[in-house]
């Protein structure tokens, strides 16, 4: 998932991350307005890294290798960029796509760039009693193991959705800024510790 050794080399700031665990950002979804109408067919024909199948989806799908991302480019000039591992990378990628569109002869601008969703993950390294957690936090939890193996926890403050797995692996989604991801994890950590599964 993340490059090994990157997170481990810096000591964790315990004032910000009392649990000692910093969630790794896995995917950033951002949007930007190129502020001009686009001929998707022309883009698909001219750009090397683009596919367009209007019967299936009304956008050009374009990919670049660095930062490794995918963009959805709509005729309205709206663009969605997904796959980056940090906010800066997401913005850099979006700028690269905008530049590609400019080079194809469209007067693309770069308006209203916005991070829409940050997905992070981490591992608390201990198993969790999901039934107990779901029972005591019923207002926030849905846990139906026949449908999905994880517990879905909808935190109100910050407004983050957490997927909590028996293994101790956690996925956090819905953040607009990374601090929300970190805060949500610190909020849930004592709860996870409380419902730690004791190995018999």
UniProtKB/Swiss-Prot annotation:
- What's a Gene Ontology MF term here? DNA binding
User: What are the protein's UniProt keywords?
Assistant: DNA-binding, Nucleus, Repeat, Transcription
| Compartments, as annotated in UniProt | Nucleus
Tell me where the sequence repeats sit in this chain: 25-101, 115-192
What Pfam families does the database record attribute to this sequence? TBP
Main location, first listed in the record: nucleus
Q: Does the keyword Transcription apply?
A: yes
Task: Cite the record's note on assembly.
Answer: Belongs to the TFIID complex together with the TBP-associated factors (TAFs). Binds DNA as monomer.
Output the PANTHER family linked to this UniProt entry.
Answer: TATA-BOX BINDING PROTEIN (PTHR10126)
Supply the name of the protein: TATA-box-binding protein 1
Organism from which the protein derives: Zea mays (Maize)
Q: What is the lineage of its organism?
A: Eukaryota, Viridiplantae, Streptophyta, Embryophyta, Tracheophyta
């Amino acid at each position: 998932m993340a490059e090994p050794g990157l997170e481990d080399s810096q000591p964790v700031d315990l004032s910000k991350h009392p649990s000692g665990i910093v969630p790794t950002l896995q995917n950033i979804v951002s949007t930007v307005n190129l502020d001009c109408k686009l001929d998707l067919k022309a883009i698909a024909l001219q750009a090397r890294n683009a596919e367009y199948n209007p019967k299936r989806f009304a956008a050009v799908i374009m990919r670049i290798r660095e930062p490794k991302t995918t963009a959805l480019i709509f005729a309205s000039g709206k663009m969605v960029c997904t796959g980056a591992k940090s906010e800066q990378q997401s913005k850099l990628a979006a700028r690269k796509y905008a530049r590609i569109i400019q080079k194809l002869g469209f007067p693309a601008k770069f308006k209203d760039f916005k991070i829409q969703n940050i997905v992070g993950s981490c591992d608390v390294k201990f198993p969790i009693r999901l039934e107990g957690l779901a029972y005591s936090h019923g207002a926030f939890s849905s846990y139906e193991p026949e449908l999905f193996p994880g517990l879905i926890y909808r935190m109100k403050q910050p407004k983050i959705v957490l997927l909590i797995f028996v293994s101790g692996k956690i996925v956090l989604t819905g953040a607009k800024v990374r601090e929300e991801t970190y805060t949500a994890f610190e909020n849930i950590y004592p709860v996870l510790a409380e419902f730690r599964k004791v190995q018999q």
